[in-house]
Amino acid sequence: MGRSLKKGPFIADSLLKKVEKQNTDNDKSVIKTWSRSSTILPVMIGHTIAVHNGKTHIPVFITEQMIGHKLGEFAPTRTYRGHIRDKKGAKS
């Protein structure tokens, strides 16, 4: 279930301030954030935001198709390396 339209989209205040400051300064440097739950707004298009995945910051370039999604959707937190293979010639 989505968020109520009456409330509007959630975005961290500090992140929104950084994006708006870069828009006024015409600066496109990487913005680091831990706010995975922030919604991507049209103001963010063209920016690169480094989203924390629990270990490192993953750079995410914002495009038009990402509007309305959350930042955390583009920075996976789990790594899957496949199931362990059986050793060759192992007896069961």
UniProtKB/Swiss-Prot annotation:
Record organism: Prochlorococcus marinus (strain MIT 9215)
Protein name: Small ribosomal subunit protein uS19
Keyword terms of this UniProt record: Ribonucleoprotein, Ribosomal protein, RNA-binding, rRNA-binding
GO biological processes: ribosomal small subunit assembly; translation
Family: Belongs to the universal ribosomal protein uS19 family.
Gene (name only): rpsS
HAMAP family in the cross-refs: Ribosomal_uS19 (MF_00531)
InterPro entries registered for this protein in UniProt: Ribosomal_uS19, Ribosomal_uS19_bac-type, Ribosomal_uS19_CS, Ribosomal_uS19_SF
Disulfide bonds: none
A single GO molecular function term of this UniProt record: structural constituent of ribosome
Name of one Pfam family that matches: Ribosomal_S19
Keyword check for RNA-binding: yes
NCBIfam families: rpsS_bact
Keyword RNA-binding: yes
PROSITE patterns listed in its UniProt record: RIBOSOMAL_S19 (PS00323)
Purpose of the protein: Protein S19 forms a complex with S13 that binds strongly to the 16S ribosomal RNA.
GO cellular component, one term: small ribosomal subunit
